[in-house]
Amino acid sequence: MCDQGELCVGGSVCDETQRKCVCAAGHRVRRDTCVLNGNSSSAIGEECAGSAGSKCEGGAECREQRCACPPGETNENGYCTKLERSRFSTYRPPTPAAFADRCPLPEQPTRCQLPDCFCSRNGREPPPGIPLEKLPQIVVLTFDDPVNDKSMRDYRHLFQDFRLVNPNGCPMKATFFVSHEWTNYDAVQWIAEQGHELASNSISHRVLSGANWTEWLAEMDGQRQIMAKFANVNEAEIVGMRAPQLGLGGDVQFLMARSSGFLYDNTISADPGIDGAPYWPHTLDFAVPYRCENDYCPRVSIPGMWALPMNVFHGTTEFLRSPMLQGMLVGNETADHVLYFLFRNFNRAYTQNRAPYILNLNAEFLQSHGGVGMRALENFLGLMTQYPDVYFLTMRELVEWMRAPQSVDQLAQKGRCPQFTYAAPSAAPTCRQPNKCMYQTPGLGSKEHQFLTCNRCPMTYPWTNNPMGATF
């Protein structure tokens, strides 16, 4: 009952007429949470039936009629993980005493060597060992913000209807920086099952500049936990992050990322100029090699942490520039105009130093002004398939390429596709009819939140400091 103003739990909301907690249409209460009729998935430790993993949540598998984590993984809050969260949940690094040194190359080559360290004095030099003409031009498609019905129409179109492959026959994959609020986790699970990369974009999507260590950890690692729990994805494979709204957090952000199991960050904006050669990824062992126009850029040495800079896009003049493609639209563009600046910025890398061309996309860019962004992107992708030396990789694959660079010829001869599958091998396929979880959230700006998941609904709406949606 909710006749005295009580908040409902378990994915239900208060029916103001009946004054009682109700689930979404077609749902019933099972073990105190709302479950879609016909959905019989089981949590870790519960009984299961059918082939291994077919009825289990959270990356578990069905063994001896009971859901259990695979060997080498442990149950953490209802999902299986290889991460030892106790290592970093309360860890606080000492305050470094000095700024990072300038890159010591080429005079002292032993101080920074691949695979764990890479730098150059001007930030524009590619990894050594491959002639420029043999370097592949790597292109990365990244998508920002929530994953829901609004954005999934475009994602399914791009990766189901508009099938494109790399020169070696491998399908093009993308990286999705997912934020929590308004995200549906059955859709996130579908993205992972298609072989795309998932990365963290925070829970609340609020700017975290000036936030402390605990706040950064709660937002970025918390979102990683939410995706593992409610999208049945392998938490250990979520190794990338991008700060919400590109709000840098200084040394705290990057120290937290490195110590809590993140491999790379894609937040720092770098402006090479309208015709300048763009900047290459680098580790933070040494000082950032480009001008940092933000007070919250990293200043100290963070060995092994990869920074993948967002090279600023330029329009036809110096005055139109942005790290996100949405910022390049002013309202009167045609698809041909957008294609022009996509191709112009691509050539800035392709004709000079082959630095990775990272496209920072979101649903707003694809759908604005009658969909000019989507039409331009389709045309751009079609043009890219005509280049024998252009390869589309995920961010994770880009870092792996940086750690062990390969020439165009080597990529073309690979016996397997350079892609990653982020769904746990024992996870069930994305369900056709997910559970709809509804919550009253008077303290979050919107009085009600809801999301879809193939798993059972949590007791309360997942949020910072409570990513599992538990009751206390």
Segments the model singles out, each with a brief description of its role:
Residues 91, 96-197, 204-207, 219-249, ...:
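Active-site beta->alpha N-cap acidic-glycine motif
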Residues 204-214, 323:
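Surface-exposed, active-site-proximal loop segments in enzymatic domains
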Residues 417-463:
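Extended, charge-rich low-complexity interaction segments
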Residues 208-211, 274-282:
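Short, charged, surface-exposed secondary-structure boundary motifs
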Residues 34-35, 80-81, 153-155, 320-322:
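Short coil/turn segments at secondary-structure boundaries
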Residues 281-333, 338, 345-349:
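Aromatic-lined glycan-binding groove of carbohydrate-active enzymes
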Residues 1-89:
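Conserved N-terminal segment of EGF-like repeats
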Residues 395-420, 432-434, 438:
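C-terminal regions of proteins
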